[in-house]
UniProtKB/Swiss-Prot annotation:
Catalysis: reaction(s): D-erythro-1-(imidazol-4-yl)glycerol 3-phosphate = 3-(imidazol-4-yl)-2-oxopropyl phosphate + H2O
Keyword Transmembrane: no
Keywords attached to this entry: Amino-acid biosynthesis, Cytoplasm, Histidine biosynthesis, Lyase
Stored PANTHER family: IMIDAZOLEGLYCEROL-PHOSPHATE DEHYDRATASE (PTHR23133:SF2), IMIDAZOLEGLYCEROL-PHOSPHATE DEHYDRATASE HIS7 (PTHR23133)
Enzyme Commission numbers on file: 4.2.1.19
Gene Ontology terms for molecular function: imidazoleglycerol-phosphate dehydratase activity
GO-annotated cellular components: cytoplasm
InterPro entries registered for this protein in UniProt: IGPD_sf, ImidazoleglycerolP_deHydtase, ImidazoleglycerP_deHydtase_CS, Ribosomal_Su5_D2-typ_SF
A Gene Ontology biological process term: L-histidine biosynthetic process
Localization: Cytoplasm
Pathway(s) annotated for this protein in UniProt: Amino-acid biosynthesis; L-histidine biosynthesis; L-histidine from 5-phospho-alpha-D-ribose 1-diphosphate: step 6/9
Protein known as: Imidazoleglycerol-phosphate dehydratase
Amino acid sequence: MPKRRARVTRKTKETDIAIELVLDGNGKYEIQSGIRFLDHMLESFSKHSRIDIALTCTGDVDVDDHHSIEDIAIVLGSAISQALGDKRGIQRYGWAIIPMDESLARAAIDLSGRSYLFFDAVFDRPTVSDLSTEMVEHFFFSLAEHLKANIHLEILHGKNTHHKVEALFKSLAVAMREAVKITSNEVLSTKGVI
């Protein structure tokens, strides 16, 4: 079976982004988002989802991190959606509960063709390194919207903001790895399409 791949670019007055990914990868990554902590989160996402990701972003981070973070989530969601094609054979659902030291995150995803985000996490710090924590939820919202997926993310408990954010990215990565897995040759929907 050929590997499922995608390439997406997005150029606006605020950002210039290119992504190439392989769903059936090994978790190899080359990430240059312009936001160091986001690089770390996307590297973790790639490694634990086993999705190979090459991403570059030139953005107006001198203004703030909003445009780059939002647009990166848009291209990531679009690229995964493109690589999934008609979603024939995918498991469709995935879930994970992942610890990161004292923090525990739960993620569930349905690659349903419908966008929805449930997000329940509170961060005690306004930033982690150069990432605004208010943008964590917005990243996942934009990802869900452009992936056309239901995503549920929760911090069940935790104290350290870095650990909470990383646990969210890792739990979604593991859930995604399960959801994109090929398990049959049919579309997992009574409608016949996803």
